[in-house]
């Protein structure tokens, strides 16, 4: 049993890996992740550099698109600082929330007022993410699972 977590671009990676690999992970969490790289300037630039101009190919690396067609309903936990300087222009967690609701995919999105994109934000809530993963891993290890 495995769990995966990350921050910012690493949060994007955690979400994408969790959603693209059904059965590999028991839980996924992210701090301030990039959730829709195909819909933000930084992501468009990066996806073009790596994958070319085929926007359809980009969907395989976009958590908002992946959550719509995920075969496994892996619970997702996302914490986002309300004062993050990248919130509106690059991160846009509301897009993931909308996609998850539309797909019936479990997502707990917690907006944290007063927090930014920093280490202090992660340090403030990492214990809750560890508990999230521990609960999922424990449930997977129980004989009734």
Regions inferred by a protein language model and the residue ranges of each:
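Non-catalytic cap/lid and distal C-terminal segments of serine-dependent acyl enzymes
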Residues: 1-145
């Amino acid at each position: 049993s495995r769990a995966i977590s990350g921050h910012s671009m690493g949060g994007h990676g955690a979400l994408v890996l969790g959603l693209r690999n059904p059965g590999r992970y028991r839980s996924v969490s992210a701090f301030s992740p990039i959730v829709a790289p195909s819909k933000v300037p930084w992501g468009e630039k990066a996806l073009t550099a790596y994958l070319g101009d085929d926007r359809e190919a980009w969907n395989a690396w976009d958590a908002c698109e992946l959550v719509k067609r995920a075969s496994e309903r892996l619970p997702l936990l996302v914490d986002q600082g309300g004062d993050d300087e990248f919130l509106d222009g690059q991160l846009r967690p509301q897009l993931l929330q909308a996609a998850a609701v539309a797909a019936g995919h479990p997502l707990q999105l917690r907006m944290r007022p007063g927090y930014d994109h920093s280490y202090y934000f992660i340090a403030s809530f990492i214990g809750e993410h560890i508990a999230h993963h521990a609960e999922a891993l424990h449930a997977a290890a129980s004989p009734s699972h």
